[in-house]
């Protein structure tokens, strides 16, 4: 599979220049940008795993401390949200990128908006629940996990098994 992220992004940029009111061009460019970052991240992580000159604990620490810049992809989703404010997937995708950027409260807001627009959006409940559990709001997180499970997200039950027990926080 040939990954031509740079040329794809350039093509979306040219299309946006010709048609700046098409929200799907911004969504697609954002997706391409985030896929490129994920691909680069996987190469970085793979390189760190095979590096011989560092001990495993420092490689693990380096991997977990690295944050990639999703700001351009988020900016594209901001534009798409202005053009198509009732499309739940924009908020869900932006929530994912905000989470990857460490901006958890903003991610929760976007997942909440996605759920408001599409109350049967199980993945949004699941992701919001994960963040709430991560932020130590286990009660709210478990409520979201329960709803995600009801909506067909089976892995939510595994999370509930761990965090939904009395005394687990």
Residue ranges and their predicted role:
Residues 1-169:
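Alpha-helical tetratricopeptide repeat
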